[in-house]
C-alpha cells in the first residue's frame, strides 16, 4: 500500500478538525439548556404538587442535558439525527394542520415576524410551495431515520395527502380527517422506529455503563473525569457557549440602542458603547456556567500569551506552558471566593474588575517564573549575544514597570482597604523578585569577565537570594493576617477559610520548613569543611594540580580530605551538600582523632611534596590552618547555583500559589 502523501494528510487533518468543530457545536445547546434551568426559579404561588413537578422536570432536564453533553461522537450524531427527524415530522404535521384548516393562516404569517410574506397567498404558487415544503420535510425525515425501500415513498405520500385535499378543495371535515390520518400514520411510524432502535439503545447504554464502571475501578474517579473532560473538549464547549451568548446579547442590545436613538447609523456613541461593554461583562458572569465560560476564554488568551512570551525570550521549558491552566483556575477560585455570580449587577462589575487586577498580578508573577530561569541561564553560560539578552531584559523591565503603574492607578482611584493592600503587596513582591533576579544576573555577568574563579560570587548570590526570600516570607505572613482580618470583619466564607489554610501551608509553613532545612544542611556541610585541613602558600604551588570538581587551579587555598585529595573549599562544600563521600575515591569525608595511614592514596595526580610524607603534610596543614569558613559563607542551595553556572536551571512556577490569600 502506498504511503499517504502530505496533501492527503492535510485533507484528513482538515476533515478531523471539521468533525471536531461540529461535535463541539452540537454539545453547546446542552449548556444553554442547563444554564436556562439554573437561572429559572419555580413560582412559589402555585400548589405544592406543581412546585414538586417543576422541580422534577428541572432535574430531569439537567440530567438529560448532562447525559447528552458527555455522549461519544457517534452517539451524539445519532441523537441529533433522531431529534432532527422528529422535529421535521412535528413541523410537517403543524404545517399541514394550519394550511388545511386555518383560513387566515397566511395572514397570521404576514402580521408576524417583521411582516415578511413567507408564502404566497393563493393559487398554484401556494400549492407548489406547500408541496416543495412537505417533500423537503419527508425526504429529510426518511434520510435521517435511514428508512429504505417502499416505506420511505409511502411516508412522503402520507405527508402530501393533506396538500392534495387542499388542492382539490375538499370539504373541511374531510380535510380534517386527512390531516388526522396523516399525523397518526407518521406518529405510528415514529413509534415503530423507536421500538426498533430501543434494543440498540439498551445495549449501548449497558455497554457504556460497564465501560465507565470498569474505568472507574481501574483508574479512579479523577482520571475518569480528566478523560471525559478531554474527550468532549469541554474547554472549547465553554468558550463557544460564552462567546455565542455574549454575541447574541450584543446583537440584541445594539438593536435596542438603535431603536432607542432612532438612527440608522451602524456606529454608536462612545457612552453607549461603554454602557454596552459594561452590560455584556455583567451578564457574562451572572451564573456559574458563564463564569466557567469566561474562565475558558481567559485560558485561551493566557495560553497564547504564554506561548508568545516563551517564543520571545527563547525558552523551551515545557513546565512554562501552564499559564493557560493557572490563569483560569485562579480566576474561577476568585469568583467562587467572592461570590461573583450572586452579586448585584453594579457590585458584580466592581468585584470583577478587582478580581482581574489580582489575576493580572498573578499572571505577571507566573511570567517572572518563566523569565527568571532564562535570565540565569544566559548569565551563567556567559552568552554575549545582545539579541539573546535583550528580550529577557525587556520582559524583566516590563515586569517591574507594570506593577508600579498598576499600583499608581489603584491608589489614585480607590481608598485604602484590604483589597487594595493585598494588590499593592503583590505588586511590591513582584518588583522585589525582579530586582533579585536582575541583581543575580548582574553578578553572574560580572563573573563572566573574570579569568579566575570568583570564590565570593556564591556568597553574594546567597546574600541576595536569602534577603529576597526572607522579605517574600514576611509578605506571606502579612497577607495571611490581612486575609484573616477580611474573613473575620468583612466577608467571611468557607472558601476563603479554605484558601487561607492553603496559603498558610504552602506559602508560610512549607517555605519556612524548606528554608530551615536548607540552612541546617548548609550548616552541616560547613562544619564538615571546617574539620578538614587547609593548604595554602608554597605547598599549594608544589601540588601543581587542579580541582577535580571545577577543573580550576588552586590560587589561594585548598582543602585536603582524609584520603589526601585536594579540592576548593567552595567546590567541596557543594559536593558535601549532596553526599558525604569523596568525589575521587568515594570514601567518607571525615576527620578522626587518630588519622589512619593513608599512604596508599595520594593526591589528585599522585604527587607528594618532597621530603614530606602524606601523614606529615596532613598534620602540618591541619596545624597551620588558621582560617575557618564561616557558616554564612555559603549560598542558598549551592547545588542550584552550580546548576545555574552550567545553564541548567530548575523552573519554580510558583506564581499562582502566592495568590491563595486573595482578599477583597
Curated annotation (Swiss-Prot):
One of its GO terms (cellular component) is Derlin-1 retrotranslocation complex. A zinc finger (RING-type) spans 547-586. Pathway: Protein modification; protein ubiquitination. It is an enzyme of class 2 (transferase). The modification N-acetylalanine is found at residue 2. Residues 599-610 have a biased composition (Polar residues). Keywords: Acetylation, Endoplasmic reticulum, Membrane, Metal-binding, Phosphoprotein, Receptor, Transferase, Transmembrane, Transmembrane helix, Ubl conjugation, Ubl conjugation pathway, Zinc, Zinc-finger. Residues 629-639 have a biased composition (Acidic residues). The modification Phosphoserine is found at residue 634. It comes from the Eukaryota. Gene3D superfamilies: Zinc/RING finger domain, C3HC4 (zinc finger). Residues 599-664 are annotated as: Disordered. Residues 616-628 have a biased composition (Basic and acidic residues). E3-ubiquitin ligase; acts as a negative regulator of cell proliferation through mechanisms involving G2/M arrest and cell death. Required for MHC class I ubiquitination in cells expressing the cytomegalovirus protein US2 before dislocation from the endoplasmic reticulum (ER). Affects SREBP processing by hindering the SREBP-SCAP complex translocation from the ER to the Golgi, thereby reducing SREBF2 target gene expression. Involved in the sterol-accelerated degradation of HMGCR. This is achieved through binding to INSIG1 and/or INSIG2 at the ER membrane. PANTHER family: E3 UBIQUITIN-PROTEIN LIGASE RNF139 (PTHR22763:SF163), RING ZINC FINGER PROTEIN (PTHR22763). The RING-type zinc finger domain may be essential for ubiquitin ligase activity. This is E3 ubiquitin-protein ligase RNF139. It comes from Pongo abelii (Sumatran orangutan).
Amino acid at each position: 500500500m502506498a504511503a499517504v502523501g502530505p496533501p492527503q494528510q492535510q485533507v484528513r487533518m482538515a476533515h478531523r478538525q471539521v468533525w471536531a468543530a461540529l461535535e463541539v457545536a452540537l454539545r453547546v445547546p446542552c449548556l444553554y439548556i442547563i444554564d436556562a434551568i439554573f437561572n429559572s426559579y419555580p413560582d412559589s404561588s402555585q400548589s405544592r404538587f406543581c412546585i414538586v413537578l417543576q422541580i422534577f422536570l428541572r432535574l430531569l432536564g439537567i440530567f438529560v442535558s448532562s447525559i447528552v453533553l458527555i455522549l461519544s461522537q457517534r452517539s451524539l450524531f445519532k441523537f441529533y439525527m433522531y431529534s432532527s427527524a422528529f422535529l421535521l415530522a412535528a413541523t410537517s404535521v403543524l404545517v399541514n394542520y394550519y394550511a388545511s384548516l386555518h383560513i387566515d393562516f397566511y395572514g397570521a404569517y404576514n402580521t408576524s415576524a417583521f411582516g415578511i410574506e413567507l408564502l404566497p397567498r393563493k393559487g398554484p404558487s401556494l400549492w407548489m410551495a406547500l408541496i416543495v415544503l412537505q417533500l423537503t420535510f419527508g425526504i429529510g425525515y426518511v434520510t435521517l431515520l435511514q428508512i429504505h425501500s417502499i416505506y420511505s415513498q409511502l411516508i412522503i405520500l402520507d405527508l402530501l395527502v393533506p396538500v392534495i385535499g387542499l388542492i382539490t378543495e375538499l370539504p373541511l371535515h374531510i380535510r380534517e380527517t386527512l390531516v388526522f390520518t396523516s399525523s397518526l400514520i407518521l406518529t405510528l411510524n415514529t413509534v415503530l422506529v423507536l421500538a426498533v432502535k430501543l434494543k440498540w439503545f439498551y445495549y449501548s447504554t449497558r455497554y457504556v455503563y460497564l465501560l465507565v464502571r470498569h474505568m472507574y475501578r481501574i483508574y479512579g474517579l479523577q482520571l475518569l473525569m480528566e478523560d471525559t473532560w478531554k474527550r468532549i473538549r469541554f474547554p472549547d464547549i465553554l468558550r463557544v457557549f460564552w462567546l455565542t451568548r455574549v454575541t447574541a446579547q450584543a446583537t440584541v442590545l445594539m438593536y435596542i440602542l438603535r431603536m432607542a436613538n432612532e438612527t440608522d447609523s451602524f456606529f454608536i456613541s462612545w457612552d453607549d458603547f461603554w454602557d454596552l461593554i459594561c452590560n455584556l461583562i455583567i451578564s457574562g458572569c451572572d451564573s456559574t456556567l458563564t463564569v466557567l465560560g469566561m474562565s475558558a476564554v481567559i485560558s485561551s488568551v493566557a495560553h497564547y500569551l504564554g506561548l508568545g512570551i516563551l517564543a520571545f525570550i527563547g525558552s523551551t521549558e515545557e513546565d512554562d506552558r501552564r499559564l493557560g491552566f493557572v490563569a483560569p483556575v485562579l480566576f474561577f477560585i476568585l469568583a467562587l471566593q467572592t461570590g461573583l455570580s450572586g452579586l448585584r449587577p453594579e457590585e458584580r462589575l466592581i468585584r470583577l474588575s478587582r478580581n482581574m487586577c489580582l489575576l493580572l498580578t498573578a499572571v505577571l508573577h507566573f511570567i517572572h517564573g518563566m523569565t527568571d530561569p532564562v535570565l540565569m541561564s544566559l548569565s551563567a553560560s556567559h552568552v554575549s549575544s545582545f539579541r539573546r539578552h535583550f528580550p529577557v531584559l525587556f520582559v524583566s523591565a516590563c515586569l517591574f514597570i507594570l506593577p508600579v503603574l498598576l499600583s499608581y492607578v489603584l491608589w489614585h482611584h480607590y481608598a485604602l482597604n484590604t483589597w487594595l493592600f493585598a494588590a499593592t503587596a503583590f505588586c511590591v513582591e513582584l518588583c522585589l523578585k525582579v530586582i533579585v533576579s536582575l541583581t543575580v544576573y548582574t553578578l553572574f555577568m560580572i563573573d563572566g569577565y573574570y579569568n579566575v574563579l570568583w570564590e565570593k560570587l556564591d556568597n553574594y548570590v546567597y546574600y541576595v537570594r536569602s534577603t529576597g526570600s526572607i522579605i517574600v516570607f514576611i509578605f506571606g505572613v502579612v497577607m495571611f493576617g490581612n486575609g484573616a482580618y477580611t474573613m473575620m470583619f468583612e466577608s467571611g466564607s468557607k472558601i476563603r477559610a479554605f484558601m487561607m489554610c492553603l496559603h498558610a501551608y504552602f506559602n508560610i509553613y512549607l517555605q519556612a520548613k524548606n528554608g530551615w532545612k536548607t540552612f541546617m544542611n548548609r550548616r552541616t556541610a560547613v562544619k564538615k569543611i571546617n574539620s578538614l585541613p587547609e593548604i595554602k602558600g608554597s605547598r599549594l604551588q608544589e601540588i601543581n594540580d587542579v580541582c577535580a570538581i571545577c577543573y580550576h587551579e588552586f590560587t589561594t587555598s585548598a582543602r585536603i580530605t582524609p584520603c589526601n585529595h585536594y579540592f576548593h573549599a567552595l567546590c567541596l562544600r557543594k559536593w558535601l551538600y549532596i553526599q558525604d563521600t569523596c568525589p575521587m575515591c568515594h570514601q567518607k569525608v571525615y576527620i578522626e582523632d587518630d588519622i589512619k595511614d593513608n599512604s596508599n592514596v595520594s593526591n589528585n595526580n599522585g604527587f607528594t611534596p618532597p621530603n614530606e610524607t602524606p601523614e606529615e603534610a596532613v598534620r602540618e596543614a591541619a596545624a597551620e590552618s588558621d582560617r575557618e569558613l564561616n557558616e554564612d559563607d555559603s549560598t542558598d542551595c549551592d547545588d542550584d547555583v552550580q546548576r545555574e553556572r552550567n545553564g541548567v536551571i530548575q523552573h519554580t512556577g510558583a506564581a499562582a500559589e502566592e495568590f491563595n490569600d486573595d482578599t477583597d
